[in-house]
């Protein structure tokens, strides 16, 4: 297959949004398919073309859309709502420039199918425009919760705007069922994101920290400040149950996009002296942190699927979710031998930390890791693309009769 992937976040960024399409592109190239990826500018670099790895899609890096920053929060919400539901002059100008740059960089390459991530409308607008010109099907990657990215009252309107998509993909059963509400009759395929090799290497190595320090790792987003405060409050209370010697060995580590929020919350709980808080770090460094921690934790939101759990489970050290988790995630945890628990309140979290502090770290001699690599999950994605291409309803008619908005 000849495939064009469109995602506004460059794969060299340290954000999870830049990984999914790029990793699947590499997996499909290894299967013999041709894949080109259109993306946003590389961090600190202008737009252009290139590749980032030996086996990787050709990258077409577009300039970011130019939008005027509104000082008023109300006006920012209004502008965002308008941008989701209809094009404005700035959007049209960007779309024309992006189309021209993409066509110029593609040369003679003509995709049979386009796959675009929904994080904002720009990727979908470009995918729809190119699909119409080439009379090929395009697919929306609704990897996240459709309702989280669209305000109430706009969700169905935005879905109708992009109804010409031949189908959708979703990163969890939770997100798939939500997408089905707004795209009735459309095929919505479940395609989990994969786990990168550094986490498998961490599992094979086992716990090897000889420093004497024992690290509690917090990963991912913090979502609600109230939940973060409960989590850190439980840690502060638990620390008081340890001996002075054990307290001196303890470190709390966070590396992620919410580092400012975590720093402020940790200060409020008197934990800054035992905390190391930084922005996001590369995956191999994160995997090493998981390997050398006595426990990895994350904060649960009922509105999303936490793909980070799969990475933590593969790495092999104990994992605790706070203050809940979906059945879908618990089922993943049951597929491997990594210790996993859901702490639903302060007392439960303190109990889990006490048990894990007293337990021996996980060794490298254990059951084989689950098959959750990007290449493993590419099986379903490849089959879905092939089914869309073979469907009589996927191409042409929907594109030609749609009025562009």
Write out the residue ranges for each language-model feature.
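Membrane-proximal helix-turn-helix segments that form the acceptor-binding/catalytic region
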Residues: 23-24, 89, 122-125, 129-133, ...
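Acidic anion/phosphate-binding donor-loop and adjacent secondary structure
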Residues: 63, 67, 150-152, 195-212
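Carbohydrate-associated surface elements
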Residues: 174, 194
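Nucleotide-activated donor-binding/catalytic signature segment of Leloir-type glycosyltransferases, i.e.
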Residues: 246-256, 260-285, 337
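Acidic donor-binding loop of glycosyltransferase active sites
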Residues: 288-304, 317
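A charged, aromatic-enriched C-terminal amphipathic alpha-helix characteristic of glycosyltransferases
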Residues: 344-351, 357-389
